[in-house]
Structures are given as C-alpha cells and as structure tokens.
Regions:
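Solenoidal tandem-repeat scaffolds enriched in leucines and small polar residues
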Residues: 130-141, 153-154
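TPR/Sel1-like alpha-solenoid repeat signature
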Residues: 46, 61-62, 74-78, 93-94, ...
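Core register positions within helices of long alpha-helical scaffolds
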Residues: 14-15, 45, 77, 109, ...
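Alpha-helix N-cap/helix-start positions at coil->helix boundaries
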Residues: 2-5, 36-37, 52, 68-69, ...
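Amphipathic alpha-helical scaffolding segments comprising HEAT/armadillo-like alpha-solenoid repeats
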Residues: 15-31, 51-64, 83-95, 115-127, ...
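Helix-adjacent hinge/juxtasegments
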Residues: 65-84
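Alpha-helical segment of the N-proximal tetratricopeptide repeat
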Residues: 6-19, 26-27, 32-49
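Conserved hydrophobic register position within alpha-solenoid helical repeats
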Residues: 8-11, 42, 74, 106, ...
Length: 164
C-alpha cells in the first residue's frame, strides 16, 4: 500500500467507530481505483455499521468492482444485512458473474436473506457448471423451500432437477 492508503485506512476505521455508514457509501461510490485492501475493508465494515441505505452501494460494488474478492465480500455483506432490496442484484450476480466465488457467495446470501422469490433463480443456479456454486444453490434452495413449507404449512414441494 502507498503511504496515503494508511491514512485512508485510519479514516475508515474512525468512521467505523462512529458507526458512520454514509462515509462508507461515499467511499465505495468513489473507490474503484483504490487498492483492493481498502475496498474490501470498507465493504466488510458495512456489515457492522450499515442499514438499508447502504444496499444500493453494495449492489454497485457487487456488479462493477474489478476484483472478484471485493464482489464476493459485497455479496457476503448483503446477505448478512438481510435486506430483500438486495435480492435482484444477488440473483444477477449468482447467475451471471464470471467468478465462481461470487456466484457461490451470492447463492449463500440469498439463503441468508430468506426471500422465497429467489427459488426459481436458485433452481437455475443448481445447474451451474461449477460444483461449489451448484451445491451452494442447492443448499440455499432447500433452505428457502423449508421456510416456504413452514410458512404455508405444506408438506411437499417439487424438487429441482439435479444434475449428478
């Protein structure tokens, strides 16, 4: 890291102590060319200081950041925050991101959010050629199906077609 990056890191940590989610939103909206460590650090901190107002910034990171690691952390943080407003971006990443770790984490995040509307898209992701992505989508599908059954009191749902 450059010397000025350490100062930026201190500023991020100060904003974290103040629980200033808006600082992180502003930072992420202008961070594309900053070092990976700073971008990932900011995304991870939002899990602890963010509320629904940070979702759109995290969704932009998930879609546009050049690093799969940063996009993965954005998906993780969106899942931990748990807002349904992130579902569309997570579905898009799960089905279309070039990186398997991003697709995997997006499926896991959808499970964490618990929105049954993601079930059809998870069923598509079960067919992913990457085994980890496919398994993550299947686990998420099973969990959301379980939630649906419990909410409706139903006993059975159609199982997705699983490639063996």
């Amino acid at each position: 890291m450059r010397p000025e990056d350490y100062k930026t890191l201190e500023i991020l940590e100060d904003a974290f102590e103040r629980k200033d989610g808006s600082h992180f939103v502003s930072f992420l909206d202008h961070s594309r060319d900053l070092p990976l460590l700073l971008r990932v650090h900011a995304v991870c901190m939002l899990e602890h200081v963010g509320d629904e107002r940070v979702v759109s910034s995290l969704c932009r990171v998930l879609k546009d950041d050049p690093s799969p690691l940063t996009r993965h952390e954005a998906a993780f943080t969106l899942g931990q925050l748990g807002y349904k407003s992130a579902v569309s971006a997570l579905v898009t990443a799960m089905l279309n991101d070039a990186s398997p770790i991003v697709r995997h984490e997006s499926a896991v995040a959808l499970s964490s959010i618990g929105d049954e509307a993601a079930l059809p898209e998870l069923e598509k992701a079960i067919q992913d050629t990457d085994e980890d992505v496919s398994n993550s989508a299947l686990i998420a599908w099973e969990y959301l199906s379980y939630l649906r059954r419990n909410r409706r009191g139903a006993r059975d749902m159609t199982k997705p077609k699983i490639r063996l």
